[in-house]
């Protein structure tokens, strides 16, 4: 199968390239870029010297459609909403890693992303690619809206209790931390080494664009849920997300009962690892892998639950989940090309 990657010079695109280089069902990866067309790919990423000698190709829709079988879009927001409608006539399956296809209501997208939404007919065709929860819809989809990094960690952490009706629909607080690669490769003052090193800061308070994505999905599972409280923090590390989620049980249960709910819920999900009671994950334990590790407990004094969910933001939070969705769409094993051991230490 010939694979195309638009936005190959960004971190998400580079991570897809890393995975698909050795994927058993990818015969060739063709790389496209609007900013560096014609350049050697290993000039943008010297760690790929001797691993690829490809040049970056221009983004020309008709040409791309004629030379690939499957397309990953790893470009910044605003690109996919413009390009995806142009591929409609070619019946090319697409996985989009930006937020352009995730929000079903165009006015909600425009409020949070501050840009024009994709055409409604494209949004209606897009399936939300939370692999463990939407497998059946993903199998037959033409367009996949790959989930954001924070929503992936948060929603995998919340799903067992939301879907079982176990928690108070008015009480969900999410305190999330991310490494700097989540901001992308383009330099900025906020992610400059001197600004990030030895520092820890909150950002986009009450304004993070992943808020409506989380709320939209939770309300699809249970329409009674009220708006959530969601805060994000930047920590001085390259990769990783930790989402600490606080919620309240409707009925009393102990930590062992909670752990059993999570273990049963994810028993057929290879990439979700539920910790034993009393054990909680760290970001280093999923680094470079497609795993999501989850720990859960309850404070029996307050009947409030703490869920800790960790992922590698570039893998399970982006490229890894995109390839997992590629596998599902093509009837392959979900683990094909993704059985990376986490890098430790």
From Swiss-Prot:
Keyword flag Protease: no
Biological processes annotated in GO: L-arginine biosynthetic process
Catalysed reaction equations from the record: N-acetyl-L-glutamate 5-semialdehyde + phosphate + NADP(+) = N-acetyl-L-glutamyl 5-phosphate + NADPH + H(+)
Protein purpose: Catalyzes the NADPH-dependent reduction of N-acetyl-5-glutamyl phosphate to yield N-acetyl-L-glutamate 5-semialdehyde.
Pfam families, per database record: Semialdhyde_dh (PF01118), Semialdhyde_dhC_1 (PF22698)
Alphabetically ordered keywords of this record: Amino-acid biosynthesis, Arginine biosynthesis, Cytoplasm, NADP, Oxidoreductase
Protein's name in the database: N-acetyl-gamma-glutamyl-phosphate reductase
EC top class, as a word: oxidoreductase
GO terms assigned for molecular function: N-acetyl-gamma-glutamyl-phosphate reductase activity; NAD binding; NADP+ binding
Lineage: Bacteria, Bacillati, Bacillota, Bacilli, Bacillales
Primary residence: cytoplasm
EC number: 1.2.1.38
Disulfide bonds: none
Subcellular location: Cytoplasm
Alphabetized NCBIfam families for the sequence: argC
């Amino acid at each position: 199968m010939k694979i195309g990657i638009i936005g190959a010079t960004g971190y998400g695109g580079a991570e897809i390239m890393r995975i698909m280089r050795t994927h058993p069902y990818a015969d060739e990866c063709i790389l496209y870029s609007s900013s560096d067309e014609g350049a050697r790919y290993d000039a943008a990423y010297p760690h790929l010297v001797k691993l690829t000698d490809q040049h970056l190709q221009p983004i020309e829709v008709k040409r791309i459609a004629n030379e690939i079988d499957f397309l990953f879009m790893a470009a910044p927001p605003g690109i996919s909403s413009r390009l995806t409608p142009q591929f409609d006539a070619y019946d090319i399956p697409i996985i989009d890693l930006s937020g352009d296809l995730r929000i079903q209501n165009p006015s909600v997208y425009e409020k949070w992303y501050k840009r024009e939404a994709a055409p409604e007919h494209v949004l209606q065709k897009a399936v939300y690619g939370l692999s463990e929860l939407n497998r059946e819809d993903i199998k037959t989809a033409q367009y996949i809206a790959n989930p954001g990094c924070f929503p992936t960690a948060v929603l995998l952490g919340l799903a067992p209790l939301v879907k079982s009706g176990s928690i108070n629909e008015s009480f969900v607080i999410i305190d999330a931390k991310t490494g700097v690669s989540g901001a992308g490769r383009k330099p900025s003052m906020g992610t400059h080494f001197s600004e990030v090193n030895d520092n820890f800061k909150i950002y986009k308070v009450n304004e993070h664009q992943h808020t409506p994505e989380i709320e939209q999905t939770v309300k699809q599972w249970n329409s009674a849920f009220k708006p959530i409280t969601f805060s994000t923090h930047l920590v001085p590390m390259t990769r990783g997300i930790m989402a600490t989620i606080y919620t309240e049980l409707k009925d009393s249960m102990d930590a062992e009962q909670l752990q059993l709910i999570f273990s049963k819920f994810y028993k057929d999900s290879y990439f979700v690892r539920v910790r034993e009671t009393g054990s909680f994950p760290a970001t280093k334990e999923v680094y470079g892998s497609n795993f999501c590790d989850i720990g859960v407990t309850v404070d029996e004094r307050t009947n409030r639950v703490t869920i800790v969910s960790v992922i590698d933001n570039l893998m399970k939070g982006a490229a890894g989940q995109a390839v997992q969705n590629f596998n599902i769409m093509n009837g392959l094993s979900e683990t094909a090309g993704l059985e990376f051991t986490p890098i430790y230490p």
